[in-house]
Structure formats: C-alpha cells, structure tokens
Amino acid sequence: MLRLGKWSYKNRNRLLVIFVLLILVVCYHYNRTFSLLNWQISFPLIVLGQTIRIWSVGVRESNRHFKIPVTAGPYAHLRNPSYLGTFFIGLGIVIMGGLLLFIPIYLALFFLLYQPTIVWEEDKLARKYGEPYVTYISTVPRWIPSIRPYPHRSAHTFLIREAFKREWGMILAILGLSLLMTMLTWLR
C-alpha cells in the first residue's frame, strides 16, 4: 500500500485532470447541457472545497519553519483538509457536468487514489515527527471533520498570501473549466 501511496501522491493531480477531461468528453459526446440546477448545486460545493483548501494551505505553507506537525486551523478538526476540499471540488465538477452516474464512479476513484496517498503520507509524517504525530492521528479523524478541535494545537497561523501563492493555479483551473463547460453548453 505504501508503494501505491507514493505513486498516487506523485500522480494525483495528473489523474484528476484526466478524470475532469473525461467528464467533459462524455458530457459533450452525450449532448449533456449544464443546467442551472446543476450549477446551483455544484457552485457551493466547489466554493466550499476551494475555501477549505485555501484555509488548510494557508496554515500549512506559511509555517514551514516549525519543526512540529501542523495541528492548528483546519488540521485541528481533520487530518486531511486539503483532500476534503479537493473532494468537494471534484464532486461539484461531476454535478456541474450533469452526469449523476459519474458520482459513484467519482467516489470510488477518489478514495482509490487518495486513501493510499494518505496512508503513505501518514507513515512518512509519523517517522518524521514521532510520538506527537502518532498521538495526533489517533485523536483526529481522517475524512469527516470533528466538531471538537484537537486539544494540543500547534502555533501555526494562517497567512492568506501564502495560501493564494499555492492555490492560484487551482482557482484558475476551476474558473477555466467552468468557462469551458459554459461555452460547450452555448455552442450546442
């Protein structure tokens, strides 16, 4: 599982791009239009996902000099907030495309890709940080956020500049994809 996790960690973005392109091709081939209802459902999911990603990246990336695991901000409630954000973005894109049959496929592919990635990352971080990280992962959930924050939060803070420095590519990709889906609808 660790070898698969390392491979999926290195290739996860490429695989998600391929999946999104597949959605576009299938939508276009089957003459799917991107309805207003689809947009009304997908837009909040995409915004939620991107907001979670910005928050988590802003906390994680702005404090690289700390020699302790990040357990503040969204990491106090969930071990993998960036991946949860990515999940909501991907789900929003699938719904935007109007391919409801793709939802179970997306769920399966997402977890097949990210579960080994997370196992690999957690193994790497446990070796790097030792007992503090092992205690953290035994307390904080992996996928579903906890209402009660982790009691031993780190001093990591959120810096918006760092968040947008890392996330501008994802934001542009989402905007570009939304524009492309809109154009495909109008061209039909």
Task: Describe these PLM feature segments.
Residues 75, 80-85:
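Glycine-rich acyl-CoA binding loop
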Residues 1-72, 87-188:
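Membrane-anchoring alpha-helices and their flanking helix-loop junctions
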